[in-house]
Amino acid sequence: MTKKAIILLSGGLDSATTAAIALAAGYQLIALSFRYGQRHERELAAAKKIANFLNIKEHHLIEVNLSLWGGSALTDQSIAIPQEGINPDIIPITYVPGRNTVFISIALSLAEAREAEAIYLGINAVDYSGYPDCRPEYLDAFQTLANLSSKAGLEGKAPQLIAPLVMDSKVDIVRRAVSLGVPIADTWSCYQGEVEPCGLCDSCRIRDQALIEAGYPELATPLLKNSRGK
């Protein structure tokens, strides 16, 4: 019997790489993407591209409008996206309250319905500035919840939360993506929803730095490439 897994596919580099890792592990993937009122909704087009590239046949787009109450620069247009660089001492305003908990809960529901063995997550605790729901402790706690709150869990068959990149640096993620043939240029990481990535938000800065260090400057944002060309 083919083993199945759910992949949370945002359209970003991390989730695309995680999807490729899951496929390499022999899973038939079911992808979940979310329109949650994010200003960078452009990532959903990237998610579709990645799903098509990886030949993922079942791809669900779920509407969960977290912008109704805002609380984050990603879901509230009145809050500016920080562009002054990363401050590791604070939880940034780009943190979306409860987002991963909502997403993983829906993934757990789908996993039970499809009898999937695993839920693959592209979360990363190393290069991000303090998101509380991107930590190994959070994953462990949610696994306990899945074990206790589901029929599959009570039968000893709860879907396992797998986050293969959680302790990888972004440079390591870039290298894994390249080794797996992930089309990095088709992924979207920028917090803005413009035609081109801004090159200034935390996500762009982290990605650009990693691409440069890994030896792929041609994949960096136009802003960085232009500045290096001067």
Curated annotation (Swiss-Prot):
<dbReference type="GO" id="GO:0016879">
    <property type="term" value="F:ligase activity, forming carbon-nitrogen bonds"/>
</dbReference>
<dbReference type="GO" id="GO:0008616">
    <property type="term" value="P:queuosine biosynthetic process"/>
</dbReference>
<dbReference type="GO" id="GO:0008270">
    <property type="term" value="F:zinc ion binding"/>
</dbReference>
<comment type="pathway">
    <text>Purine metabolism; 7-cyano-7-deazaguanine biosynthesis.</text>
</comment>
<keyword id="KW-0479">Metal-binding</keyword>
<feature type="binding site">
    <location>
        <begin position="9"/>
        <end position="19"/>
    </location>
    <ligand>
        <name>ATP</name>
    </ligand>
</feature>
<keyword id="KW-0436">Ligase</keyword>
<dbReference type="Pfam" id="PF06508">
    <property type="entry name" value="QueC"/>
</dbReference>
<keyword id="KW-0067">ATP-binding</keyword>
<protein>
    <recommendedName>
        <fullName>7-cyano-7-deazaguanine synthase</fullName>
        <ecNumber>6.3.4.20</ecNumber>
    </recommendedName>
</protein>
<feature type="binding site">
    <location>
        <position position="198"/>
    </location>
    <ligand>
        <name>Zn(2+)</name>
    </ligand>
</feature>
<dbReference type="InterPro" id="IPR014729">
    <property type="entry name" value="Rossmann-like_a/b/a_fold"/>
</dbReference>
<keyword id="KW-0671">Queuosine biosynthesis</keyword>
<dbReference type="InterPro" id="IPR018317">
    <property type="entry name" value="QueC"/>
</dbReference>
<feature type="binding site">
    <location>
        <position position="204"/>
    </location>
    <ligand>
        <name>Zn(2+)</name>
    </ligand>
</feature>
<feature type="binding site">
    <location>
        <position position="201"/>
    </location>
    <ligand>
        <name>Zn(2+)</name>
    </ligand>
</feature>
<comment type="similarity">
    <text>Belongs to the QueC family.</text>
</comment>
<feature type="binding site">
    <location>
        <position position="190"/>
    </location>
    <ligand>
        <name>Zn(2+)</name>
    </ligand>
</feature>
<keyword id="KW-0862">Zinc</keyword>
<dbReference type="GO" id="GO:0005524">
    <property type="term" value="F:ATP binding"/>
</dbReference>
<comment type="function">
    <text>Catalyzes the ATP-dependent conversion of 7-carboxy-7-deazaguanine (CDG) to 7-cyano-7-deazaguanine (preQ(0)).</text>
</comment>
<keyword id="KW-0547">Nucleotide-binding</keyword>
